Amino acid sequence: GDMDAFYEAFADDAKFDGLFNDWDNDPLTKDQFMAAQMDFLKLYSVNSFDCVWVKYYEFDSQLNYVQSWWRVSVTRKSDNKVTVFPVMINHGFNEEGKIVRHNELWNEAILD
């Protein structure tokens, strides 16, 4: 499915972090993040996930860094409430072009 194609872009040892994770917790593994996404998809249907801005950066300390902003629309399955919200995603890439770092920032409280 679409999620399989999404995860093909990630290295097997990729680390996933963001505001969904408590400050003192380690980043999630690929399997842990996949499970968390499946839990989310049990509660919500994704209507759209549209990129509105993307920028490639190269810093001395961190090469191959991409930051993007997305406009996401979801429908809560329990009551069909539609919510549209912004998500900022930062990705770091390895030499093979696979994503090794995924950091997503969005306000989960907007779904309440």
Name each model feature, range by range:
Residues 67-96:
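Exposed beta-sheet edge and beta->alpha loop/turn motif
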